Amino acid sequence: ELEYKYSGDKGVKIFGYTENMYEWMKSSSVLITKAGGVTISEALASNIPLILFNPVPGQEMENARYFKKHNMAKIAENQEEVLKYVEQLLSKDDIEMMKINMMKNYLPKASYNICEDIMSYLDSI
């Protein structure tokens, strides 16, 4: 449906499943996405500022609020806000500040540390 809708638009390319999402993300200045845990974690690890689109109540909203609170993302409720934030981020120093905040909040050994804590706890009981 999207391919048909945008078939005449040279500025839009619709991709299906891709094995090389990391490459697409690394070549991006900003990522517009839902606030799912895996995607925003990948963006954090890749240091790509986020525009989180219309997060649903629950985990997505909490993820979005956390990233916004720490100035690592903007939350857009509609397409107009997405465009506003893209223009804002690409024309100001905001995007660099978001990248700095992402570097500060990224914990590269988080999984390892969690496993170590669990093993330490299990050894103590």
Predicted regions and their residues:
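Nucleotide-activated sugar donor-binding and catalytic core shared by glycosyltransferases
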Residues: E1-I125
